Swiss-Prot record:
The lineage of its organism: Bacteria, Pseudomonadati, Pseudomonadota, Alphaproteobacteria, Acetobacterales. It comes from the Bacteria. NCBIfam families: tatB. GO terms for cellular component: TAT protein transport complex. This is Sec-independent protein translocase protein TatB.
Length: 177
């Protein structure tokens, strides 16, 4: 209870032997033991009464809270709070590795298809030529437009289009089997 070491108890015993004397030590030990027993029983009784008061006071509140929580759908409530328009969910649902249709060049009144080659097959010259062509002729593939439109609201539109045009950073190797 008080975390006494054996050496401290021995020092207390020696001091008691010297102060009280060997003749009165058994009576003093009985008195100390009686006081410790009484203190323990009072502490246990107090603890029991406090526990009973806590149970009586909180049980009704706990029941009401539990009944209120029983009908709550936490997943639905969190998704409604964090993503009210569903834009974050659609961002994570899109597959960036899915094949995209050929890009459309919006030049005059009509749109025509452009040949699409894998990113890793482009040379540096082709890449710079394509970049200048994209900015000059406003090339927008339907996949790029869709990815830019589904970008989260906090991303500016210009940045959304730039990041949607970029090829993915990781292209998995072809299956060898």
């Amino acid at each position: 209870m008080f975390d006494f070491a054996w050496s401290e108890i021995a020092v207390i015993g020696v001091v008691a032997l010297v102060v009280i004397g060997p003749k009165d030590i058994p009576g003093a030990v009985r008195g100390v033991a009686r006081m410790v027993r009484k203190a323990r029983s009072m502490a246990a009784e107090f603890q029991g009464q406090m526990d009973q008061m806590m149970k009586e006071a909180d049980l009704g509140d706990v029941r009401e809270t539990f009944n209120d929580l029983r009908g709550v759908n936490l997943r639905q409530q969190l998704s409604r709070t964090l993503d009210p328009d569903g834009s974050m969910r659609s961002t994570f649902d899109n597959n960036p590795m899915a094949p995209s249709p050929a890009p459309m060049i919006m030049g005059g009144d009509e749109a025509h298809m452009v040949e699409e080659r894998p990113f890793h097959s482009l040379s540096v010259m082709d890449e710079s030529h394509m970049a200048s062509e994209w900015t000059r002729e406003k090339t927008v593939s339907s996949e790029t437009a869709r990815r830019a439109a589904t970008a989260p609201a906090f991303i500016p539109p210009g940045e959304a289009f730039r990041s949607a045009r970029r090829a993915p950073a990781f292209i998995p190797p072809a299956d060898q089997g």
